């Protein structure tokens, strides 16, 4: 007995519809899984990026803190501002140092030096002899054998007196309106974010005995406590001031 062709066609159509429905479910599940995977991957990449920024930014802060005081006379405090979330200090970041090749009078603005190359206009400079120091600002880029100041020194210096750059640095937490907190790095007036998405930043100041101090003259170490993003585990480190 031959069955009607319409029955076979109906069965085939039902099977196709069931298969399509099953395929749609599988496709939906697969799409959901891919979306979830992409979301997790993006979160992991964001976390890795934050951690990399944290490591690099913290390394820069540590290295520059070690130089605190190298851009000042030896009897001046290495740190000029001690805050829980802000620190300001002077350092000779590029180790730019030279000496006077001739005596300089108190009214002199043009300093004869051994080498003034790569000393940029606007930088603070310090001149020191055995018993006194003075500060000035470069009126223009340094030349091979001279440095020009914006104003006279006010005191005389003998030949052989040391001249060095004093970079002014400041690290602080900035919270843009409605945005995440950033750790900012300011050098000689220009500032930029060095670590983003900061959720905790704390500075503590220690003397040579490892005791907390609020007196800049006695600070020899700085403890840094930093947390980035929503991580429970942050970074805690102590930095000794090499310049003191």
Where are these regions (language model features)?
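Short, glycine/small-hydrophobic-rich surface segments
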Residues: 43, 65-97
